[in-house]
Swiss-Prot record:
The gene is rplO. Belongs to the universal ribosomal protein uL15 family. Part of the 50S ribosomal subunit. PANTHER family: 50S RIBOSOMAL PROTEIN L15, LARGE RIBOSOMAL SUBUNIT PROTEIN UL15M. One of its GO terms (biological process) is translation. Signal peptide: none annotated. One of its GO terms (molecular function) is structural constituent of ribosome. Pfam families: Ribosomal_L27A. InterPro entries: Ribosomal_uL15, Ribosomal_uL15/eL18, Ribosomal_uL15/eL18_sf, Ribosomal_uL15_bac-type. The keyword Ribonucleoprotein applies. Keywords: Ribonucleoprotein, Ribosomal protein, RNA-binding, rRNA-binding. This is Large ribosomal subunit protein uL15. HAMAP family: Ribosomal_uL15. Binds to the 23S rRNA.
Length: 150
């Protein structure tokens, strides 16, 4: 047997019905669309229409909204800054700003930056920070060791 002698078994592959190819084809004239009306015309697709029953979109209640004035913050933790200091990516002499954190790779976009102190009860290095927001605990820890919030 050669490749050019291969063929499908009988009935394994059914030819598709060619519609609108004359009355004798069995799907001619109206091409299975019925007679007249909106759904027999071309370009019809009534989105969300369920045949007169109340559509799903109307049956479900409205929920919430998207506030356009919401500020998106990059959250950074004090221990992330401590790690960057020990790695040598940041220095205690520098003023730590949003741009510096982006350069070092602690944040990945230019949204606002908020400093938190989750899981950090002590902080050794006195730093100068110029960020957009601070948690009260982070503020306290930085000022306790002689750091500045600009």
């Amino acid at each position: 047997m050669k490749l050019n002698e291969l063929y499908n078994n009988l009935g394994a592959k059914k030819n598709k019905k060619r519609i609108a190819r004359g009355i004798g084809s069995g799907k001619g004239k109206t091409a299975g669309r019925g007679i007249k009306g909106q759904k027999s015309r071309s370009g019809v697709a009534i989105k969300g229409f369920e045949g007169g029953q109340t559509p799903m979109i109307k049956r479900l209640p409205k929920r919430g909204f998207k506030c356009i004035s919401t500020k998106k913050y990059n959250i950074i933790n004090i221990y992330n800054i401590e790690e960057a200091l020990t790695d040598g990516r940041l220095s205690t002499n520098d003023i730590i700003t949003k741009e510096k954190l982006l350069e070092v790779g602690l944040i990945n976009n230019k949204n606002l930056v908020k400093l938190l102190s989750i899981c950090s009860d002590d902080f050794a290095s006195p730093l100068s920070l110029k960020l957009d927001a601070y948690s009260s605990k982070a503020k306290y820890l930085i000022e306790k060791v002689g750091g500045q919030l600009l």
